[in-house]
């Protein structure tokens, strides 16, 4: 149990730092769409799709790696709370179109990235 807790802790910290670095680098590039948050959510969605595909096929992987990558890293990297706050900020500024676009791009993009990764990595592990 302690190993699993440490895996979540280490993965979560690493994912959070990665999200912060993405936000610092890419959020200033566009005034209405926080590109760093979007990148974090899309990358995290892809990684979790890849992880679930691999873990469903490769049942001998240590559970520590599973929670480190999915619950830990992807949980720290992706962010629904920051995304929600950024949408509310856009709404408060009266930028309703940008807020709606932000919602659609984050949600649909994340679903698409998870599905793509799951499909790609399920196909690659069937050999």
From Swiss-Prot:
Binding site for Na(+): 75, 78
Origin: domain of life: Bacteria
Transmembrane parts of this sequence: 4-24, 35-55, 71-91, 103-123
GO biological process terms held by the UniProt record: cellular detoxification of fluoride
Localization terms from the record: Cell inner membrane
Molecular function GO labels: fluoride channel activity; metal ion binding
Keyword Transmembrane helix among UniProt keywords: yes
Activity-regulation annotation: Na(+) is not transported, but it plays an essential structural role and its presence is essential for fluoride channel function.
Keyword Disulfide bond listed: no
Membrane topology: Multi-pass membrane protein
UniProt entry keywords in alphabetical sequence: Cell inner membrane, Cell membrane, Ion channel, Ion transport, Membrane, Metal-binding, Sodium, Transmembrane, Transmembrane helix, Transport
Catalytic activity: fluoride(in) = fluoride(out)
Disulfide bridge positions per record: none
InterPro entries membership: FluC
GO cellular component terms given for this protein: plasma membrane
UniProt function note: Fluoride-specific ion channel. Important for reducing fluoride concentration in the cell, thus reducing its toxicity.
PANTHER family, per database record: FLUORIDE EXPORT PROTEIN 1-RELATED
Family stated for the protein in its record: Belongs to the fluoride channel Fluc/FEX (TC 1.A.43) family.
Name of the protein in question: Fluoride-specific ion channel FluC
Organism: Escherichia coli O81 (strain ED1a)
Gene designation: fluC
């Amino acid at each position: 149990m302690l190993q699993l807790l440490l895996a979540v802790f280490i993965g979560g910290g690493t994912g959070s730092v990665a999200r912060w670095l993405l936000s610092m680098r890419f959020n200033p590039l566009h005034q209405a769409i926080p590109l760093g948050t979007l990148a974090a959510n899309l990358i995290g969605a892809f990684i979790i799709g890849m992880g679930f595909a691999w873990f469903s096929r490769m049942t001998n992987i240590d559970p520590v790696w599973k929670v480190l990558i999915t619950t830990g890293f992807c949980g720290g990297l992706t962010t629904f709370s920051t995304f929600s706050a950024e949408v509310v900020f856009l709404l408060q500024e009266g930028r309703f179109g940008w807020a709606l676009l932000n919602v659609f791009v984050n949600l649909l993009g994340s679903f698409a990235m998870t599905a793509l990764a799951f499909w790609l990595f399920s196909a690659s592990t069937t050999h």
